[in-house]
Amino acid sequence: RLSLVGSEMCIRDSLQKGDEIIISTLEHHSNIVPWQMICEITGARLVVTPINQKGEIVMGEFVKRLNSKTKLIAISHVSNTLGTINPIYEMVELARKYNCKILIDAAQSAPHFELDVQKIDCDFLVFSGHKTLAPTGIGVLYVKYDLFEEMIPFIGGGDMIKEAVSYTHLRAHETET
């Protein structure tokens, strides 16, 4: 699910050389490796915000890392190793000041907390299905509606296509011009 967001951002050229993605030292490798790979492809830079001795994100350091180059913050709601609950509401509010997107990895929180994506105001929220007793290999990717409408699918077919002919197609939400 994280790779889908990153891949789509590459396709849309919304990440370019010099842009920055912020993660924390609390992240599971599934929220590190996709961004490392995307940075290698795009020339964007991965910026890591530190934690203190209690395992909490140092908010002052997080704020220092935010700037006009920040395009995405990808942060865990709850740490998989320490159980630390990150201040996602505060982090989203700060992200909005810099007009960057925010992705919440809710793999550890989805089974234990009520998650209201409208209240959180995140752009993306992801979690693995097996954390909620679903089968292994499936998961959830929430995308804020306005971003979903802008996204360019990199896998197509089925109900997403309104009409297809030999050399072109019309997506279900598009109108003919």
Residue ranges and their predicted role:
Residues 104-106, 110, 116-134, 139-143, ...:
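Conserved active-site segment immediately N-terminal to the catalytic lysine
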Residues 133-137, 142-171:
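Active-site C-terminal subdomain of aminotransferase-like
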Residues 45, 51-111:
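Active-site phosphate-binding strand-loop segment of PLP-dependent enzymes
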